[in-house]
Amino acid sequence: MAGQTDPHISLFSPQEVEFMAEDELVEIVPNMNMEQLNFISGDFGRFIPQIPTKVPLWLAVALKRRGKCTFRPPGWMSVDNLTQILEAERESQSTFQALPFSYVEIARLLFDHARDDIPDMYMVRSLVEDIRDVRLHKLETNLGSFQGTSAVKISNVSAMEVNIVRPFVIRALEAFYKHDKPEADVDRDTRSSRQQRETNNEPRRPLRQR
């Protein structure tokens, strides 16, 4: 897997998050006969024309590019379902609606490679983008309320949203542990540091001449 973009804050790039999402299973309808495919991640197929089967997203994209299958969009990508989710997201400022962990990346890959297989594609894309924007706004707003808390629980966040929150949480925990350090430890560290400085500043004993 690609290395982390910034090791200090453990932030992944959008390309890295999308790469990890490509292991999600999606349903396709093959238009060819093919024997079972064996991978480290599992066995997929065999593939029979017009018989739906589930494969990793990366494999589905590869088959689609070769004209070997069509996609069956996941149920959550329907206009009706996305409209309900968007309304619920707007109504609540403190909770997030349940969506696949990689919903943004899955939708983006389907828009790029299987737009002809998605009913009302432009409406679906608009709804997904609106949902993403509303959730990001809520997330940014709620981050300010986490100041001074020792524990935070956020349910139903996506991979992209976790990636955004991670740097904030790391910095908050670092500050929490720094300020929560017992005074005894601080005093001990201070004394040790002072003793070290005094030792370093002591005059050196002259060497005895032979």
From Swiss-Prot:
Cellular component GO terms, alphabetical: nuclear chromosome
Primary residence: nucleus
Compartments it resides in: Nucleus
CDD domains: GINS_A_psf2, GINS_B_Psf2
Keywords: DNA replication, Nucleus
InterPro entries tied to this protein: GINS_A, GINS_bundle-like_dom_sf, GINS_Psf2, PSF2_N
SUPFAM superfamilies per UniProt: GINS helical bundle-like, PriA/YqbF domain
Highest taxon listed in the record's lineage: Eukaryota
Quaternary context: Component of the GINS complex which is a heterotetramer of GINS1, GINS2, GINS3 and GINS4.
Biological role: The GINS complex plays an essential role in the initiation of DNA replication.
The name this protein goes by in its record: DNA replication complex GINS protein PSF2
Organism this protein belongs to: Arabidopsis thaliana (Mouse-ear cress)
